[in-house]
């Protein structure tokens, strides 16, 4: 459990943290999280806004947990669109899921389109989602760490991004942005260049990248008498990172090194180690996997269930407000009228027991026994002067009921407004670039897309 909590709390673990903690949750360098006994956490604002919305929690069904010592949700519907917050691999018996996250703003725009389309259809509440609609709104994976995803075209006129969203399975080739600093540092004989990795692929750590580059350099020295391109010593390959937003792996090149050759070596290492096999496995009622699932299927199932749950929640809230008004009207009738209150108190005192008193009073004042039981608990402390307060509460509840009726008449609009509010607070612009290419190991293409040049100030 401590490991799962750490993953949800890391700024480089998921796109939107569900947990906030001041404890050590590991680092982008590969450091492990602190021991569980030192860990204190609380839910983040994103989790409270999306996963623990009061409207949906009121109608969530629960069942006994594994040990029957508590309860857990049968199904947990949230305001977080499908796969917005997935940047982790999940594995279980006989099946696994490894699906990178998509952008929250893109998902909300897509949901807004689907809700508007559904509102105009004859079968309101049952959503239809096509693959072409998905491809129009969802551009592909979006990692909090940025980077570039190469959309590799195939012979059958499909591509990696289409496979990712439509077929539920693909291989994504993720590469970081690399800065070339000309004349970065002074050496004997002149100034040498430096390559600086400013991003790291999803799931990688800076130390893992450094180890891979260092091992490749050592292999070159061993096999080809000193064919290395990195300066010897600890200054040749250094990690100056300060979190996921400030990644900085500095590769000092030897004087006279062909920069493009060194860059190609680094790219080859990263492409081999950090291509991601993305897939979502659909399971049947018995928990057995039988096929991959597309994003359109995920979105359709999500919206159908969310619509039904929102409708259920609004009706539950409306019914609760009506019951509150019935109680308030009964209080006005019984507690704010002196004669009725005397009758009420006398009946309580003369009845042989509480149950008998509740039944007599329910018949006398023509209200439910539950309302009478509630009024008995406050009868001795309630004042006849509270009538105006009760009336104000009734008026407030009636306004809330009218607002709920408006939402029930157009649940799609209610859902759009809710998602827009979440995107406004928690959404961010896309950080991951999508680059179409037909050949992955094209040195000129990689140089053009990944490298930007600066010159060190002297």
Model-derived features with residue positions:
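Long, structured ligand/cofactor-binding scaffold of large enzymes
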Residues: 1-52
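Conserved alpha/beta core surface patches that mediate binding of polyanionic ligands
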Residues: 2-11, 67-79, 166-173, 223, ...
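General structural feature for long, well-ordered alpha-helical segments within catalytic domains
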Residues: 4-8, 39-46, 76-79, 103, ...
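Short coil/turn connectors at secondary-structure junctions
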Residues: 14, 56-57, 80, 86-88
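Long, charged, glycine-rich C-terminal linkers/tails
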Residues: 16-26, 58-69, 224-239, 438
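Alpha-helix capping and helix-loop boundary segments enriched in small/acidic/polar residues
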Residues: 30-34, 67-71, 75, 98-102, ...
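A short, contiguous, amphipathic alpha-helix enriched in charged residues
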Residues: 37-71, 198-229
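C-terminal interaction appendages of subunits in large macromolecular complexes
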Residues: 82, 88-458
């Amino acid at each position: 459990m401590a490991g799962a909590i750490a993953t949800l709390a890391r700024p480089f673990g998921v796109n939107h943290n569900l947990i906030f903690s001041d404890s050590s949750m590991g680092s982008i360098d590969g450091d492990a999280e602190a021991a569980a006994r030192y860990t204190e956490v609380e839910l983040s604002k994103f989790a409270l806004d999306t996963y623990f919305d009061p409207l949906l929690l009121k109608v969530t069904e629960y069942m006994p947990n594994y040990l029957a010592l508590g309860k857990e949700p049968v199904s947990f519907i949230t305001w977080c669109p499908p796969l917005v917050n997935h940047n982790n691999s999940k594995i279980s018996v006989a099946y696994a899921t490894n699906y990178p996250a998509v952008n929250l703003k893109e998902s909300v725009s897509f949901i807004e389109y689907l809700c508007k389309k559904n509102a105009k259809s004859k079968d309101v509440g049952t959503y239809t989602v096509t693959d072409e609609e998905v491809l129009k709104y969802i551009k592909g994976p979006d990692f909090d760490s940025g980077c570039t995803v190469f959309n590799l075209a195939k012979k059958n006129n499909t591509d990696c991004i289409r496979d990712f969203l439509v077929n539920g399975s693909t291989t994504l080739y993720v590469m970081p942005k690399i800065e070339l600093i000309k004349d970065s540092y002074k050496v004997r004989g002149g100034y040498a260049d430096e390559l600086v990795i400013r991003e790291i692929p999803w799931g990688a750590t800076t130390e893992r990248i450094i180890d891979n580059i260092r091992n490749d350099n050592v292999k070159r020295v061993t096999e080809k008498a000193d064919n290395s391109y990195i300066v010897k010593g600890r200054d040749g390959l250094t990690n100056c990172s300060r979190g996921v937003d400030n990644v900085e792996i500095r590769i000092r090149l030897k004087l006279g090194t062909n920069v493009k050759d060194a860059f190609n070596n680094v790219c080859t290492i990263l492409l081999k180690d950090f291509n991601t096999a993305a897939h979502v496995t659909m399971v049947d009622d018995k928990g057995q996997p039988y096929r991959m699932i597309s994003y359109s299927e995920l979105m359709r199932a999500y919206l159908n269930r969310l619509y039904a749950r929102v409708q259920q929640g609004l009706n539950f809230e409306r019914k609760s407000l009506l019951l509150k008004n019935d109680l308030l009207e009964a209080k006005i009738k019984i507690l704010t009228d002196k004669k009725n209150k005397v009758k009420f108190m006398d009946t309580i005192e003369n009845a042989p027991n509480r149950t008998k008193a509740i039944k007599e009073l329910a018949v006398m004042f023509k209200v439910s026994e539950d309302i009478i039981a509630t009024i008995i608990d406050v009868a001795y402390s309630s004042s006849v002067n509270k009538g105006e307060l009760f009336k104000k509460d009734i008026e407030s509840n009636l306004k809330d009921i009218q607002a709920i009726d408006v939402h029930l008449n157009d649940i799609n609009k209610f859902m759009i407004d809710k998602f827009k509010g979440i995107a406004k607070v928690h959404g961010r612009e896309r950080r991951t670039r999508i680059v179409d290419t037909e050949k992955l190991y094209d040195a000129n293409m990689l140089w053009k897309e990944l490298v930007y040049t600066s010159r060190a100030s002297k």
